[in-house]
């Protein structure tokens, strides 16, 4: 492997992880959140098993508050690529009227994402689940293994993890336990964008700069994506040139001012970026809703 480029080494590692899981687990799944990382994961999964399709389904946990363009892109990719798409919604949360505006980011994320994910994993009895998390994103993710052990309640205990030496992974689990698998652990945000550029991977158009209706709220530029977003008194809607570095539920995801309208522009922008992509995620902002706490409860 000494003649491989940096991106080729990362690609080879990720493909090895995909094949290791397919060979050792009985019922794996890939979480497909429709993010740029998910798009890279989909591309790698297709490569890993070509010309056969990936030997596992793709799961989308729908909070009912995702950007409309994300859902359109998700369905288009499933049709084009022909993979098995499972969509799960926490119906009890919907009946209870749980939402980011009425209940806040912490309750909404816990009920509609964390509990929703646990419901789906239990329903289909998956014993391994791929995710697109990377160690450079956030400090709790920086200490997580590529093969991250979860107990029967889907909880993560950072003190109860397995060593990973020489690319040898312990894939054994008892009944009810599972492993979260992160093939992109060693990638950076810049690596992701350079790989997307190199491989010409389709991504949600929201990642590219365009004029969009946004309001400035709580230090974030929130896009008005549908009529469920109620404006505060004196809060103007402005059409500004923005893009998104990260995607999630639209009321909890901040845009950034940017003129990067193509992949080359985004890579150039990333070369001078000095802030985390997750600065635009409201769910990471308060201690009560910290990422590590969410992961201990079963969040990805």
From Swiss-Prot:
Enzyme Commission code: 2.7.7.4
Name assigned to this protein: Sulfate adenylyltransferase subunit 2
Known role: With CysN forms the ATP sulfurylase (ATPS) that catalyzes the adenylation of sulfate producing adenosine 5'-phosphosulfate (APS) and diphosphate, the first enzymatic step in sulfur assimilation pathway. APS synthesis involves the formation of a high-energy phosphoric-sulfuric acid anhydride bond driven by GTP hydrolysis by CysN coupled to ATP hydrolysis by CysD.
Single GO MF annotation: sulfate adenylyltransferase (ATP) activity
Region (Disordered): 281-300
Subunit structure: Heterodimer composed of CysD, the smaller subunit, and CysN.
Similarity comment text for this entry: Belongs to the PAPS reductase family. CysD subfamily.
Catalytic activity: sulfate + ATP + H(+) = adenosine 5'-phosphosulfate + diphosphate
